[in-house]
Regions:
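Glycan-recognition and catalytic cores of secretory/periplasmic carbohydrate-active enzymes
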Residues: 2-351
């Protein structure tokens, strides 16, 4: 750094980026890590820069970047993985509607359009796992289906677009057909093949949730949205398969535990009647999302939703919400605050 920058620039940059003579990077994965390695980072994020310091920082960054460009670039990993994109899709959709960030919802829609266009074969209900430079592989993994089913359901509940729910149903059917064990229940991690000695079932939620945990939770939500019994049947059978594992080592499957809790009681169904593109309808959708209520699904009144929702209509020309459990519903309302109150967990008063 000192050889690239002037003395004044280096005096500013070295402490600002946390550079030390012995290095600030510790490689705990290597028995003999290389010494003196520094990873440039903002050492004090709370520090406020003066005007001259901001100008100095801009100059420093330009010089360091120009020097970096002269080095041989590392290989670029720019493949698209469906499983990871499913997790991102769900996060963007849910955060976008809760935080009222249209750009995040737009990014979620673009994600959905790309994957369903490039990596989905509707004729065979096949979801491919990897895409790069216009080519997709033939690998079939449960995590791709389960994670993208999860993400699609989050996007549907954020937008109430019936085409997204239709896709989710097809994806769930493809996942069950390709991975579900009809004899012992549960989902295999991959498709069978001549070079595969046996098909395993994952049983650990790590940095990425296991395919079985994600599949169970997503199927339970899909069953609540559509009232298709087969999805709940498959999910409950899988929960029973993992009951011993969850009992003996609950920390191994936290998402499976969350799915079991969801299955244990009738979820709220927040049915929003109205055009999802209108601002007044979006306010009701956001209100339904804004309360922490894990036992809840949000659905519209068109498309392949559960039959009762199809009978619910807007009242007096206004978007209307119906919060239901089982066969009973609260009085219909167009007031976002009333939706929040209806969904708020018992024993937790309004802030």
């Amino acid at each position: 750094v000192s050889s690239i920058l002037t003395k004044e620039e280096a005096t500013f940059a070295i402490p600002y980026f946390g550079i030390t003579p012995k290095g600030n990077f510790e490689d705990h994965s290597h028995p003999n890590p290389l010494p003196g390695l520094n990873v440039l980072h903002i050492a004090d994020p709370e520090r406020k820069l003066s005007g001259p310091e901001q100008s100095l920082l801009a100059t420093v960054k330009t010089k360091l970047y120009d020097a970096q460009r002269k080095r041989i670039r590392p290989h670029l990993d720019d493949k698209v993985l469906t499983s990871w994109n499913g997790l991102l899709l769900g996060s963007l959709a849910r955060a976008g509607v809760i935080m009222d960030e249209p750009a995040w919802l737009d990014a979620a829609r673009k994600n959905f359009t790309f994957v369903t266009t490039k990596l989905w074969d509707p004729a065979t209900k096949t979801l491919y796992h990897r895409w790069r430079d216009g080519e997709r592989d033939t690998t079939q993994l449960l995590t791709a289906y389960a994670n993208y089913l999860h993400g699609s359901l989050e996007l549907y509940q954020a937008t109430l677009d019936p085409a997204i729910l239709t896709f989710a149903i097809d994806l769930a059917d493809g996942m069950i057909a390709k991975f579900y064990d009809e004899k012992a229940s549960g989902f295999f991690s991959s498709m069978g093949g001549a070079d595969l000695l046996f098909r395993a079932k994952d049983d650990y939620d790590g940095a990425e949730p296991s395919g079985n945990s994600t599949a169970v939770y997503a199927l339970l939500k899909l069953a609540a949205l559509t009232e298709k019994a087969t999805y709940r049947t498959k999910a409950e059978a899988t929960l029973k398969l993992y009951a011993t594992r969850v009992t003996e080592l609950p920390q191994a499957l936290p998402l499976m535990l969350q799915a079991a809790a969801f299955a244990d009681e009738e979820p709220f169904r927040a049915v929003i009647a109205g055009d999802p593109a209108l601002p007044e309808t979006k306010l009701l959708i956001r209100a339904a999302h804004s309360v922490y209520q894990p036992h809840r699904v949000i659905l519209g009144t068109t498309g392949p939703v559960e039959p009762f929702a199809l009978t619910l209509l807007p009242r007096e020309g206004k978007a209307t919400a119906y919060v239901c459990t089982g066969n009973s519903c609260r009085p219909p309302t167009s007031d976002p605050a009333e939706i929040q109150q209806s969904l708020r967990p018992k024993g937790k008063p309004s802030p």
